[in-house]
C-alpha cells in the first residue's frame, strides 16, 4: 500500500493558515486536525469553528482527532457539522459508548477513526475493529508536537496489518507523532 501524506495542523502558523493550506493542498491526501481540551492532554488546540473555516479553503478530507475528556455525541456532532470527513476518537475515552458513537458517525455519512495511545492494545478494539475505517497509532504521548517516536508502537502497527490481512478488514493505518526521522 502506498504511503499517503496527511499533515497535522497542530504546529502550523495560525497567522498564515490560508497560505500554508494552499501550499500543502497539492501534496496532502487529507489533513489531520487535533481538538485538545487541556484535560485529555495538557495542551489546547483548535475548536470545531476552525474546522468550518478550514473547510472554506480546502476540499481535501479532514480527519478530526477529538482528544477531550468526557466526550459526548455533542462534540462528535459539532465536528461533523463543521465539516469533518473522518471522526477519530481516542480508544481509552470510548467506554460503553463505543457502538453508539460508531453508529452515529456512520449515520451522519462520515468515516470512523479510532486512536490508540502508546499504551493501548489492539485487544482493546477487537469487538469493533471491523467497523473502523482509520486506525491511528499515537507514536508519542498525546498533546505535543516534536517528540521522539516511541519505537514499540511500530510493533503494534505491524500487528494491526497482520490482523487486517487475516480477517479481511479494510481499515487504513496511520501514525501520529514522532515521524521526524
Language-model-detected regions and their locations in the chain:
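Conserved N-terminal beta1-alpha1 strand-loop-helix module at the mouth
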Residues: 1-88, 94-97, 111-112, 125-132, ...
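A short, flexible beta-alpha/helix-coil linker loop
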Residues: 37-38, 140-144
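Short gly/ser/thr-rich secondary-structure transition/capping motifs
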Residues: 115-119
Amino acid at each position: 500500500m502506498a504511503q499517503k501524506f496527511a499533515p497535522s495542523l497542530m504546529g502550523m502558523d495560525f497567522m498564515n493558515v490560508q497560505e500554508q493550506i494552499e501550499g500543502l493542498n497539492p501534496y496532502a491526501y487529507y489533513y489531520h486536525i487535533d481538538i485538545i481540551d487541556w484535560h485529555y492532554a495538557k495542551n489546547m488546540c483548535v475548536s470545531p469553528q476552525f474546522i468550518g473555516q478550514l473547510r472554506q479553503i480546502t476540499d481535501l478530507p479532514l480527519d478530526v482527532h477529538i482528544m477531550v475528556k468526557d466526550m459526548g455525541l455533542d462534540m462528535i456532532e459539532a465536528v461533523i457539522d463543521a465539516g469533518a470527513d473522518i471522526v477519530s476518537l481516542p480508544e481509552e475515552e470510548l467506554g460503553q459508548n463505543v457502538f453508539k458513537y460508531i453508529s452515529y458517525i456512520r449515520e451522519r455519512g462520515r468515516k470512523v477513526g479510532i486512536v490508540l495511545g502508546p499504551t493501548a492494545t489492539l485487544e482493546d478494539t477487537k469487538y469493533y475493529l471491523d467497523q473502523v475505517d482509520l486506525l491511528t497509532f499515537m507514536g508519542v504521548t498525546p498533546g505535543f508536537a516534536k517528540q521522539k517516536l516511541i519505537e514499540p508502537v511500530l510493533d503494534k502497527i505491524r500487528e494491526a496489518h497482520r490482523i487486517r490481512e487475516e480477517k479481511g478488514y479494510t481499515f487504513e493505518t496511520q501514525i501520529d507523532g514522532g515521524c521526524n526521522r
